[in-house]
Amino acid sequence: MRGYLDLMKLRVVELLLVSTLPAMVLAAKGLPEFGLAFATIFAGTLAAGSANAFNMVIESDLDKLMARTAKRPVVTGQISKKNATVFATLIGIISLVIFWIFTTALATLLTFIAIVFYVVVYTMALKQRTAQNIVWGGAAGCMPVLIGWAAVTNSLSLTAWAFFFVIFFWTPPHFWALAIKYKDDYAAAGTPMLPVVATKGRVLKEMWFHTILMIASSVWLILAADLPMWSLAITVALGLVFARQLIALKEGSTEYAKVAGKIFQWSITYLSLLSVLLVVAQLLS
Protein backbone atom coordinates (compact mmCIF):
# COMPACT_ATOMS: atom_id res chain seq x y z
CA MET A 1 0.00 0.00 0.00
CA ARG A 2 2.84 2.38 0.85
CA GLY A 3 4.25 1.99 -2.65
CA TYR A 4 0.96 2.98 -4.26
CA LEU A 5 0.71 6.06 -2.05
CA ASP A 6 4.25 6.95 -3.12
CA LEU A 7 3.12 6.68 -6.75
CA MET A 8 0.60 9.43 -6.09
CA LYS A 9 3.27 11.86 -4.75
CA LEU A 10 0.93 13.00 -2.00
CA ARG A 11 3.25 15.79 -0.85
CA VAL A 12 3.07 17.31 -4.32
CA VAL A 13 -0.69 16.73 -4.42
CA GLU A 14 -1.05 18.57 -1.10
CA LEU A 15 0.67 21.60 -2.59
CA LEU A 16 -1.58 21.50 -5.65
CA LEU A 17 -4.72 21.35 -3.53
CA VAL A 18 -3.65 24.28 -1.34
CA SER A 19 -5.19 26.56 -3.96
CA THR A 20 -8.38 24.54 -4.52
CA LEU A 21 -10.24 25.42 -1.33
CA PRO A 22 -9.49 29.17 -1.55
CA ALA A 23 -10.80 29.11 -5.12
CA MET A 24 -14.01 27.47 -3.89
CA VAL A 25 -14.37 30.02 -1.08
CA LEU A 26 -13.92 32.91 -3.51
CA ALA A 27 -16.38 31.37 -5.96
CA ALA A 28 -18.99 30.80 -3.25
CA LYS A 29 -18.34 34.20 -1.64
CA GLY A 30 -18.06 32.26 1.62
CA LEU A 31 -17.69 28.68 2.78
CA PRO A 32 -18.80 26.18 0.13
CA GLU A 33 -21.14 23.33 1.06
CA PHE A 34 -19.13 20.73 3.00
CA GLY A 35 -20.08 17.76 0.84
CA LEU A 36 -19.11 19.62 -2.32
CA ALA A 37 -15.78 20.72 -0.85
CA PHE A 38 -15.00 17.20 0.38
CA ALA A 39 -15.86 15.60 -2.96
CA THR A 40 -13.76 18.15 -4.84
CA ILE A 41 -10.71 17.77 -2.59
CA PHE A 42 -10.94 13.96 -2.49
CA ALA A 43 -11.50 13.56 -6.22
CA GLY A 44 -8.82 16.17 -6.90
CA THR A 45 -6.37 14.13 -4.83
CA LEU A 46 -7.14 11.04 -6.89
CA ALA A 47 -6.85 12.95 -10.17
CA ALA A 48 -3.50 14.50 -9.30
CA GLY A 49 -2.32 11.15 -7.94
CA SER A 50 -3.32 9.50 -11.21
CA ALA A 51 -1.30 12.01 -13.25
CA ASN A 52 1.70 11.58 -10.96
CA ALA A 53 1.52 7.79 -11.17
CA PHE A 54 1.43 7.91 -14.98
CA ASN A 55 4.43 10.25 -14.79
CA MET A 56 6.40 7.73 -12.73
CA VAL A 57 5.65 4.95 -15.21
CA ILE A 58 6.70 7.04 -18.21
CA GLU A 59 9.83 8.45 -16.56
CA SER A 60 11.02 5.34 -14.70
CA ASP A 61 14.07 4.96 -16.97
CA LEU A 62 15.02 8.59 -16.26
CA ASP A 63 14.23 8.39 -12.55
CA LYS A 64 16.81 5.65 -12.04
CA LEU A 65 19.51 8.05 -13.25
CA MET A 66 18.70 10.65 -10.58
CA ALA A 67 19.66 10.21 -6.93
CA ARG A 68 16.55 12.13 -5.86
CA THR A 69 14.19 9.74 -7.66
CA ALA A 70 16.11 6.47 -7.74
CA LYS A 71 14.06 4.96 -4.92
CA ARG A 72 10.65 5.50 -6.48
CA PRO A 73 8.52 2.33 -6.45
CA VAL A 74 8.56 1.66 -10.21
CA VAL A 75 12.32 2.19 -10.40
CA THR A 76 13.04 -0.22 -7.54
CA GLY A 77 10.61 -2.82 -8.85
CA GLN A 78 8.39 -2.57 -5.79
CA ILE A 79 5.52 -1.98 -8.22
CA SER A 80 5.59 -3.13 -11.84
CA LYS A 81 4.91 -0.73 -14.69
CA LYS A 82 1.78 -2.71 -15.53
CA ASN A 83 0.36 -2.51 -12.01
CA ALA A 84 1.28 1.17 -11.72
CA THR A 85 -0.48 1.89 -15.02
CA VAL A 86 -3.60 0.00 -13.91
CA PHE A 87 -3.58 1.89 -10.60
CA ALA A 88 -3.16 5.27 -12.31
CA THR A 89 -5.97 4.51 -14.73
CA LEU A 90 -8.30 3.26 -11.99
CA ILE A 91 -7.95 6.22 -9.63
CA GLY A 92 -8.17 8.60 -12.59
CA ILE A 93 -11.49 7.10 -13.64
CA ILE A 94 -12.78 7.12 -10.05
CA SER A 95 -11.88 10.80 -9.71
CA LEU A 96 -13.80 11.69 -12.88
CA VAL A 97 -16.84 9.70 -11.74
CA ILE A 98 -16.84 11.50 -8.38
CA PHE A 99 -16.52 14.89 -10.07
CA TRP A 100 -19.35 14.02 -12.46
CA ILE A 101 -21.72 12.82 -9.75
CA PHE A 102 -21.00 15.29 -6.97
CA THR A 103 -19.77 18.47 -8.67
CA THR A 104 -20.32 19.87 -12.16
CA ALA A 105 -19.79 18.92 -15.79
CA LEU A 106 -17.24 21.71 -16.26
CA ALA A 107 -15.20 20.62 -13.24
CA THR A 108 -15.18 17.07 -14.60
CA LEU A 109 -14.03 18.23 -18.04
CA LEU A 110 -11.28 20.42 -16.59
CA THR A 111 -10.05 17.52 -14.47
CA PHE A 112 -9.81 15.28 -17.53
CA ILE A 113 -7.95 18.02 -19.41
CA ALA A 114 -5.55 18.49 -16.48
CA ILE A 115 -4.64 14.79 -16.35
CA VAL A 116 -4.14 14.54 -20.12
CA PHE A 117 -2.18 17.79 -20.25
CA TYR A 118 0.21 16.75 -17.49
CA VAL A 119 0.78 13.25 -18.82
CA VAL A 120 0.81 13.84 -22.58
CA VAL A 121 1.79 17.47 -23.10
CA TYR A 122 4.19 17.98 -20.19
CA THR A 123 5.64 14.55 -19.41
CA MET A 124 5.71 13.04 -22.90
CA ALA A 125 6.05 16.05 -25.21
CA LEU A 126 7.76 18.93 -23.40
CA LYS A 127 9.86 17.85 -20.45
CA GLN A 128 12.74 16.28 -22.36
CA ARG A 129 12.57 18.64 -25.34
CA THR A 130 12.65 22.25 -24.12
CA ALA A 131 14.12 24.33 -21.32
CA GLN A 132 10.74 26.06 -21.10
CA ASN A 133 9.11 22.75 -20.17
CA ILE A 134 7.93 23.85 -16.74
CA VAL A 135 6.59 27.17 -18.04
CA TRP A 136 4.02 25.57 -20.31
CA GLY A 137 3.73 22.20 -18.63
CA GLY A 138 3.19 23.93 -15.32
CA ALA A 139 -0.24 25.00 -16.55
CA ALA A 140 -1.47 21.61 -15.34
CA GLY A 141 -0.55 22.63 -11.80
CA CYS A 142 -2.80 25.68 -12.14
CA MET A 143 -5.85 23.63 -13.01
CA PRO A 144 -6.97 22.92 -9.40
CA VAL A 145 -7.91 26.61 -9.15
CA LEU A 146 -10.19 26.40 -12.17
CA ILE A 147 -11.55 23.01 -11.11
CA GLY A 148 -12.39 24.28 -7.62
CA TRP A 149 -14.10 27.35 -9.05
CA ALA A 150 -16.04 25.33 -11.63
CA ALA A 151 -17.13 22.84 -8.96
CA VAL A 152 -18.99 25.68 -7.24
CA THR A 153 -20.31 27.71 -10.18
CA ASN A 154 -20.03 25.46 -13.27
CA SER A 155 -18.42 28.46 -14.94
CA LEU A 156 -15.15 30.42 -14.95
CA SER A 157 -14.86 34.12 -14.15
CA LEU A 158 -12.06 36.67 -14.49
CA THR A 159 -11.31 36.12 -10.80
CA ALA A 160 -10.73 32.43 -11.45
CA TRP A 161 -8.36 33.24 -14.30
CA ALA A 162 -6.53 35.81 -12.17
CA PHE A 163 -5.91 33.09 -9.57
CA PHE A 164 -4.85 30.73 -12.37
CA PHE A 165 -2.19 33.18 -13.53
CA VAL A 166 -0.85 33.69 -10.01
CA ILE A 167 -0.06 29.96 -9.90
CA PHE A 168 1.08 29.94 -13.54
CA PHE A 169 3.74 32.59 -12.92
CA TRP A 170 4.60 31.19 -9.47
CA THR A 171 5.44 27.77 -10.91
CA PRO A 172 8.64 28.51 -12.90
CA PRO A 173 10.63 30.20 -10.09
CA HIS A 174 9.38 27.51 -7.70
CA PHE A 175 10.60 24.62 -9.87
CA TRP A 176 13.70 26.34 -11.20
CA ALA A 177 14.85 26.83 -7.62
CA LEU A 178 14.48 23.08 -7.15
CA ALA A 179 16.27 22.44 -10.44
CA ILE A 180 19.19 24.61 -9.30
CA LYS A 181 19.49 22.52 -6.15
CA TYR A 182 19.36 19.26 -8.11
CA LYS A 183 21.08 20.50 -11.26
CA ASP A 184 23.45 17.53 -11.47
CA ASP A 185 20.55 15.08 -11.17
CA TYR A 186 18.65 16.67 -14.05
CA ALA A 187 21.82 16.82 -16.14
CA ALA A 188 22.46 13.11 -15.53
CA ALA A 189 18.96 12.32 -16.77
CA GLY A 190 19.37 14.56 -19.81
CA THR A 191 16.43 16.74 -18.75
CA PRO A 192 16.94 20.26 -20.16
CA MET A 193 15.70 22.22 -17.18
CA LEU A 194 16.63 25.88 -17.58
CA PRO A 195 19.28 25.87 -14.79
CA VAL A 196 20.97 22.93 -16.57
CA VAL A 197 21.25 24.49 -20.02
CA ALA A 198 21.38 28.24 -19.32
CA THR A 199 23.71 30.60 -17.48
CA LYS A 200 23.00 31.69 -13.91
CA GLY A 201 22.29 35.19 -15.19
CA ARG A 202 19.69 33.94 -17.67
CA VAL A 203 18.02 31.80 -15.02
CA LEU A 204 17.86 34.70 -12.58
CA LYS A 205 16.37 37.03 -15.21
CA GLU A 206 13.68 34.47 -16.05
CA MET A 207 12.90 33.97 -12.36
CA TRP A 208 12.58 37.73 -11.89
CA PHE A 209 10.32 38.03 -14.95
CA HIS A 210 7.89 35.40 -13.68
CA THR A 211 7.99 36.69 -10.11
CA ILE A 212 7.04 40.21 -11.21
CA LEU A 213 4.14 38.82 -13.25
CA MET A 214 3.12 36.67 -10.29
CA ILE A 215 2.92 39.74 -8.04
CA ALA A 216 0.98 41.65 -10.71
CA SER A 217 -1.44 38.74 -11.06
CA SER A 218 -1.94 38.58 -7.30
CA VAL A 219 -2.91 42.26 -7.31
CA TRP A 220 -5.34 41.54 -10.15
CA LEU A 221 -6.78 38.66 -8.13
CA ILE A 222 -7.45 40.78 -5.04
CA LEU A 223 -9.09 43.52 -7.11
CA ALA A 224 -11.13 41.10 -9.24
CA ALA A 225 -12.39 39.30 -6.13
CA ASP A 226 -13.29 42.66 -4.56
CA LEU A 227 -11.44 41.79 -1.36
CA PRO A 228 -10.55 44.38 1.33
CA MET A 229 -7.65 46.74 0.69
CA TRP A 230 -5.77 45.41 3.71
CA SER A 231 -5.53 42.07 1.93
CA LEU A 232 -4.04 43.82 -1.10
CA ALA A 233 -1.32 45.33 1.09
CA ILE A 234 -0.49 41.94 2.60
CA THR A 235 -0.49 40.30 -0.83
CA VAL A 236 2.00 42.82 -2.19
CA ALA A 237 4.15 42.41 0.93
CA LEU A 238 4.24 38.63 0.46
CA GLY A 239 5.26 39.13 -3.15
CA LEU A 240 8.05 41.52 -2.19
CA VAL A 241 9.39 39.01 0.33
CA PHE A 242 9.38 36.45 -2.48
CA ALA A 243 11.32 38.87 -4.68
CA ARG A 244 13.81 39.50 -1.87
CA GLN A 245 14.76 35.85 -2.02
CA LEU A 246 15.88 36.34 -5.62
CA ILE A 247 18.17 39.17 -4.51
CA ALA A 248 19.66 36.74 -2.01
CA LEU A 249 20.23 34.26 -4.84
CA LYS A 250 22.37 36.80 -6.69
CA GLU A 251 24.17 37.93 -3.55
CA GLY A 252 24.72 34.36 -2.41
CA SER A 253 26.43 33.18 -5.58
CA THR A 254 29.01 31.24 -3.58
CA GLU A 255 26.21 29.18 -2.03
CA TYR A 256 24.00 29.14 -5.10
CA ALA A 257 22.36 25.75 -4.54
CA LYS A 258 21.81 26.38 -0.84
CA VAL A 259 20.10 29.71 -1.44
CA ALA A 260 18.01 28.15 -4.22
CA GLY A 261 16.84 25.52 -1.74
CA LYS A 262 15.64 28.28 0.56
CA ILE A 263 13.79 29.95 -2.31
CA PHE A 264 12.07 26.66 -3.08
CA GLN A 265 10.91 26.34 0.53
CA TRP A 266 9.79 29.98 0.70
CA SER A 267 7.81 29.61 -2.51
CA ILE A 268 5.75 26.90 -0.81
CA THR A 269 5.28 29.13 2.23
CA TYR A 270 4.26 32.02 -0.03
CA LEU A 271 1.54 30.02 -1.75
CA SER A 272 0.26 28.65 1.55
CA LEU A 273 0.09 32.10 3.17
CA LEU A 274 -1.58 33.62 0.11
CA SER A 275 -4.19 30.86 0.15
CA VAL A 276 -4.94 31.42 3.84
CA LEU A 277 -5.12 35.17 3.24
CA LEU A 278 -7.66 34.74 0.45
CA VAL A 279 -9.91 32.60 2.63
CA VAL A 280 -9.71 34.95 5.61
CA ALA A 281 -10.22 38.08 3.48
CA GLN A 282 -13.25 36.58 1.76
CA LEU A 283 -14.85 35.41 5.02
CA LEU A 284 -14.28 38.81 6.65
CA SER A 285 -15.43 40.90 3.69
What are these regions (language model features)?
Residues 68-109, 199-223:
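Multi-pass membrane catalytic core of lipid/isoprenoid biosynthesis enzymes
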Residues 81-152:
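Intramembrane alpha-helical segments
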Residues 18-21, 72-73, 136-152, 201-202, ...:
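Small-residue-rich segments of transmembrane alpha-helices in multi-pass membrane proteins
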Residues 46-54, 116-123, 165-183, 215, ...:
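Transmembrane alpha-helical segments that form the membrane-embedded catalytic/substrate-channel core
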Residues 146-156, 214-221, 270-285:
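Hydrophobic alpha-helical transmembrane segments in multi-pass integral membrane proteins
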Residues 243-273:
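Interfacial loop-to-transmembrane junctions
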Residues 1, 58-79, 176-203:
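Cytosolic, membrane-interface loops and tails of multi-pass inner-membrane proteins
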Residues 18-60, 68, 92, 97, ...:
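Membrane-embedded alpha-helical segments that form the functional core of polytopic membrane enzymes
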